[in-house]
Amino acid sequence: MLRRALRGLLAAPIIAALLITTAPSASAAQLTQVTNFGPNPSNLQMYLYVPNKVKPRPAVLVASHYCTGSGPAFYTNTEFARLADRYGFIVVYPSVTRASKCFDVASPQTLRHGGGSDSLGIVSMVRHVLQRNNADPNRVYATGHSSGAMMTNVLLGAYPDVFRGGAAFAGVPFACFATTNGSEWNSQCANGQLVKTPQQWGDLVRRAFPGYTGPKPRMQLWHGTNDDTLRYPNFGEAIKQWTNVAGIGQTPTSTDRPQPNWVRTRYNLGGAVQVEGISVQNGSHNFVVAGMAQYAVDFLGLSR
């Protein structure tokens, strides 16, 4: 089942031709592997990109790859390093070592604050950067595509004390993929058949870190209407979840079209955009194209 289900995700490397617009110059900083960065229960690899010029207290962006991908592949095939050069933030590229090359977004451990597995390993990477690179703990964010988008939801759900916001490209809500039998795949969720009330979705996040009363992460969600791998209903379910976590309603504050085939809905909290959903009309699972990363960076405040 997992092998068949992953076939749609195996196509993710085709985004390489769509995402990158210009190669880094010869004088650009290089991606480096970091070892011994802290607790790492699932043996993730850590790759780090620090631009030649960073801000005095740089922000940190975790950029998580798709299934079958890797940290170096996501570095090469996306715009985030180039945008880091422009705006002076640091990018962490986690890399899965298990056979599927998919992030663990399903186990009870990864879905619980301090529970273990991939989410804890990634938090260790962040803490390492905060300590070694004088980065700003109040400006830590996550993004990713497909499996990486699902991990983005996991990180914001289980570690709201670490991540202030995220941008998830073609993912599913936090805990939608939850399993207890060791499986990496949840067909009901992937097929868009797991439907809950906003309260139920929000409760899943709140139970991941009981007693947490700090700031709620901001979330930007992207999904193609023709996604046949992680189907489009997951987009609406994720909006339900993150608006409920923020304590705001389901009615958009505003709706517009930044591009002809995009419909963007925004949900404000205290006059600022807390949740943003961008529906890509006729977009497939691999809808991501050049320029979308800039929208994500702008939403997260990394361009300021």
Give residue spans per PLM region.
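Secretory targeting and sorting signals
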Residues: M1-A28
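Gly/Ser-rich "nucleophile elbow"/oxyanion-hole loop immediately N-terminal to the catalytic nucleophile
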Residues: N52-R57, V105-M150, G157-F163, G214
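Short substrate-entry loop that stabilizes the transition state in hydrolases
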Residues: V54-K101, C176, N286
